[in-house]
Swiss-Prot record:
Lineage, highest ranks first: Eukaryota, Metazoa, Spiralia, Lophotrochozoa, Mollusca
GO molecular function: heme binding; iron ion binding; oxidoreductase activity; oxygen binding; oxygen carrier activity
Keywords: Acetylation, Heme, Iron, Metal-binding, Muscle protein, Oxygen transport, Transport
Pfam families: Globin
Anything else known: This molluscan globin lacks one of the heme-binding histidine residues found in most other globins.
This protein's name: Globin
Amino acid sequence: MSLSAAEADLAGKSWAPVFANKDANGDAFLVALFEKFPDSANFFADFKGKSVADIKASPKLRDVSSRIFTRLNEFVNNAADAGKMSAMLSQFAKEHVGFGVGSAQFENVRSMFPGFVASVAAPPAGADAAWTKLFGLIIDALKAAGK
């Protein structure tokens, strides 16, 4: 339940410029997710039933996006450590199943995240596959937890 050291390095190198401006990039990613998958907003108590325009104007956007990007940063920083990843994925899956969030929602994220990363800065060759694998681990953990 981890990435290889080389995969983790690729994810980390492509993630660094994104996380360097985590506030703006986190907001932009969340808005892009809601624009592409409008039902995704309904999984967030602060955004349920709101339009993308209302979400963009919400003071809660930064709080939510910051929590998401901080958590994702933890996954990236520990991606090659099977023991840590196993524990983190298990905890993450339990939390998200409790919110009603399952593998389908993270399939949506996985489908667009490498492109989002590339929109911030050109990733190294192979980074897309590393991100696909990382989100695959999250999806597998959610499936194992029943979602």
